[in-house]
Amino acid sequence: MRLKRLELWWRALWIRILVRLMRRPSAAEARPEWGSRPFRVLFLRHDRAGDMVVSSGVMRGIARSHSTITLDVLASPANASIIDGAEYVHEIVVFDKKRLGDYLPTLGRLRRARYDAVVDCMVTAPSVTTLLLILASGARYRVGIAGRGNDAAFNVTVPPETRAGAHMIDLLAALAGAFGVALDESERHPVLAVTDEEQKRAAAVWGSGFRALVNISAGTSERNWSDSRYVAVMKYLAERNPDVVLRVISSPSEAGRAQRIAHDGGGEYARTPSIRDAFALIATADFVFTPDTSIAHAASAFHIPTVAIYVRGKAERWGLYGTVGESVEHSEPNFETLDVEVVTAAISRVLSASLSRPA
């Protein structure tokens, strides 16, 4: 506990130091005329895969807000490939914040790019790394959400989303206001694309029938669900629809576990060497079941009927968005006592609802 308090104190100290170094320019230049000349804008999203997915619609909205804007994205090794080929992204800068050797080259690259504006992706709390990147970019305009205790670091601020229980996508959408646009739900909705070749490879994994994809990897221990319960879900899907084709995916580190679950549940394990391989399987599925991960966000992006399971307090901000599905939130901080019957009841409702979904 004492070590944690020291860590928080040290982080807060660095944030105060960086904010003082980043004192905003005069009010006279606080609001750019985005349509008046070309602007090169950098959106910072150097974190997890799911964060990139939930930001994708907002990034596209910013890029399309004015024909004069060229949008680059600072990504991490974990999420850079997600936006490969995205028509709204000009250039992807990959930065690994866990590698000290990446800092100086990346900071130098940002400075040489001469960005006109940089957008802070941290919409709920400030980040030392993000503030450092903003400072290093040398961008004249610094765009961020107001009210996080670091307003002095920005000269283009927008008010936060204030609705109770707002989804992370809605919190991020507030950033578009800095560019003079208000994104509706369809415009802020996550957007992903897979190539024809990726679709072809995914199609080869599926047989004929109702395509049900089960992801068993959750990323953190509290979101682990027992093998037997995943098997029970698969058997329920087979009982409900004898024509079902069951495929199981996982992170590479859990391949052995996924193979056992697939075998016991009457399905097959599908290798996904990259996250784009997983996304292609989602895009071609008829139904997805997953714990709270980027897989759930990708299913939202592709509008695939989905049931996703969440630990207490997570579904509201990180649940499914704008697709047929249910975000099942357990009452406990882990999945140890999450009953199969609760999940299969949700699956039944979602599958019934998806029958009336427009083709």
Regions of interest found by a model, annotated:
Residues 1-359:
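Catalytic machinery of carbohydrate-active enzymes
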